[in-house]
Structures are given as C-alpha cells and as structure tokens.
A protein has these predicted regions:
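Extended beta-strand solenoid/passenger and fiber regions
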Residues: 70-132, 156-195, 291-292, 299
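Low-complexity "stalk/linker" and mucin-like segments enriched in Ser/Thr/Pro/Ala/Gly
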Residues: 132, 296-298, 304-320
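A short beta-strand micro-motif common to beta-rich folds, especially ectodomain repeats
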Residues: 328-341
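Extracellular/luminal low-complexity segments enriched in Ser/Thr/Pro
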Residues: 139-145, 317-329
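Short S/T/G/P-enriched beta-strand
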Residues: 257-284, 288-290, 343-357
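Extracellular recognition modules
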Residues: 153, 286, 334-336
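Solvent-exposed edge beta-strands and adjacent loop segments
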Residues: 1-77, 128-129, 199-227
Length: 357
C-alpha cells in the first residue's frame, strides 16, 4: 500500500433527518477523538496482569467554522430557524423629516418593547435619546418644527429576516454528520502527487449529538467562530443478527484505485463440491486482500471460470454455476480475477468437483 497522509480541516455535511442544513466548507478545525477506559484484570501471586476489561467508549468530535451560520447555532440550542424576526429600524444619515404638528410617521410598523410600543429620537447633533410612545404608527415630538430632521430608532417585525428562540432549557439536536478529509501521497518517488489530492477520507456518523455549547466571541481584532462540538451515539446498523452497535464508519477512497489491484488471492468458499448427476451448484468466490483487510465474497461477474480437467463430468458457465453431466468422475474448475494487474495466474483459485456414480 502506498504511503499517504491527511492534512487540513475537513469539509462537513450536516443533515437533520433528510434535510441538508449546512455544508461546512470553511472549517478552521476538526478534531476526531476516540477513547475507551481499560480496567486491568489482575490476580494470583504477584498480582499478575491477565487481561483488560474495556468500557465507556467515546467518540467526540470538535468542529469550528470560521463563517457564521444561524442553522448551526439553532442546532446547538435545539431549536428551528423561523422566517421573520424582530429587527431594529435606524434612520439613515439624513434622518426622518418632521411633518405637521411635530409628527413623524414611521416607515415600518413598530412592535412592542418591554410591554409598550416605543420609539427613540434625537437631533443629529444631540447625544441623548428621548423615548416616545408610538400611536397610530407615528410619534409626536414636542416643540419640533415642520421640516426638522431627527434620528429615530424602533423595533419592528421584519419578514425578510430569520430568527431563533433561545430557550432557557433546551436539548441540542442530534444530526447526521459526514466529514470529508483530503488524502495526499507520501511516497518519495511520487513527489508531484503529494502536492495534489490523492484521495479522501469519509467519516460517517449517523447519530451525532451536539453538546449544546456555543461561544460566540466578538472582538476588535478577530472574527467570531461557530462551534459544533458533539459526540457520536451508538446505533444498531441492522447488518447482523446479533446486537452490534456502531458509532459510524470511516472510508478511505484513493482516486483511480481499483479493488482488483488490492486482491492478493482468490479463494472459493465451496471449493470441494459433491454433485449428483445433472445437479448444479454456484461457486462462492472470495477476494482475499491481505494486509489486515477482511476477505469479501464478490459477485461472480468479476471472475472468469474455466474447466481445467474432467470436462466430461462437469461444466461451468460465466456466472460460476457448476453443472454435473451424466458421466461420473471428477473435474477441476479454475477461477481467475478479471481486470487485475499482473499475470492472470497470480490470482487464481480452484474448485474440485466430484460427480457421483
């Protein structure tokens, strides 16, 4: 296997149910932290170590995005984003013009603030603001003259905005998280490839429980970042008859790679077959990868099947179905991998077929 390395923050996909609520392309940090507690099993003279019992496995992930996203904050607080929200109207540079009787008609419909519908005004040159009660969506300024200009502020409902409710007690959302990290070549003989993407590492966490912490820090010398830290929750993937919960999966994808090139040998699960005359059986062919990679039964369309000897007793078709003839005897079937690098004989398996009298 070629030497590879991974560097840089991941890209992230955040799903809530089937809805894609965010794509993290500007993450500044992604930390994948798995841990487990091991208890030593000791006993006997000298209190020897006989084994370890492992418990409390954790998979924690830290994610920091350099860009602000209200959806991320909402997910941390366990709420949904709503269309529309309370906004603050602030006069433009020219201010608002006073009409007859010292009245200024508000551009937007003011809403209540602390139980009353209020607005605040001042002349551009003044420092202090004066509060006024809004009546019929207008304010009256005593002693103001028609044509005077005032700065005005008030709250109104802006349907073009988006808002969230910050609850006093909340449960952070559980998302489906997918992290995508770039892989690069680490081979000395392949320096050019080390500067470009060689592949990618895809981490899939179906149940990602956010920890609910959010620290938006604004300062004069930095931008506020959004965090989406959390932990993986165990799920039963349903692929086994036994309860075998998982936290997720991690997939290494090398661009241009073929699984056939990683096969070290071909093995046949039913390599010794006993058949009655005219009976048939399908070969079960496994690709042996080696290097700690589990062998896997592959579809027979990936292999070539040939009768090497005993053709009078058995035949095999392109789908790997062995059929006995009416002649008793033995036959040898060879199985070779298609589209594999090297000689065909490098990756070959055999099945022995016995046809009963």
């Amino acid at each position: 296997m070629a030497n590879i390395f991974t560097a840089g923050p991941a890209r992230a996909l955040f799903f809530y149910g089937q809805q894609l609520i965010g794509v993290g392309k500007t993450l500044s940090e992604t930390v994948f932290d798995s841990s487990i507690t091991g208890e030593e099993v000791r006993g006997g003279p000298g209190n020897l170590l006989y084994g370890k019992y492992f418990h409390d496995p954790n998979l924690n992930i830290q994610i920091t995005d350099a860009m602000f996203n209200l959806q991320y904050v909402a997910a941390s607080l366990g709420v949904d984003v709503n269309q529309g929200g309370v906004s603050l109207y602030e006069s433009a540079k020219a201010g608002e013009t006073v009409g007859a009787s010292g009245k200024i008609t508000l551009t937007e419909t003011a809403v209540a603030f602390d139980g009353a519908i209020l607005a605040w005004y001042k002349k551009p040159a003044d420092d202090d603001w004066t509060v006024a009660t809004v009546s019929e969506n207008a304010i009256t300024i005593p002693s103001a003259k028609t044509g005077d200009h005032y700065c005005v502020k008030y709250f109104y409902q802006n349907m073009n905005a988006k808002s969230i409710t910050i609850k006093a007690q909340y449960v952070p959302k559980t998302l489906h998280l997918v992290l995508i990290n770039d892989l690069y070549s680490g081979d000395v003989a392949n320096v050019a490839a080390s500067t470009s993407k060689y592949g990618r590492l895809i981490t899939d966490i179906p149940q990602y429980q956010l920890d609910g912490s959010q620290n938006l820090s604004w300062s004069a010398t930095s931008a506020a970042t959004v965090s989406l830290n959390g932990s993986a929750l165990a799920i039963d993937d349903g692929t086994s008859c036994e309860e075998d919960p998982i936290y997720g999966t991690m997939t290494q994808e090398i661009f241009g790679a073929k699984w056939q090139d990683d096969v070290k040998a071909v093995a046949i699960g039913n390599a010794d077959i006993d058949l009655a005359k005219s009976a048939s059986e399908t070969l079960q062919v496994y690709a042996v990868f080696g290097g700690g990679v589990a062998s896997r039964m592959m579809d027979n369309s990936n292999f070539n099947f040939t009768v090497e000897s005993g053709g009078t007793s058995a035949s095999v078709n392109e789908s790997g179905v062995v059929t006995a003839t009416t002649t008793a005897g033995t036959a040898v079937i060879s199985v070779t991998l298609k589209d594999a690098a090297g000689e065909a004989t490098d990756k070959i398996g055999y099945a022995n077929v016995t046809v009963a009298n």
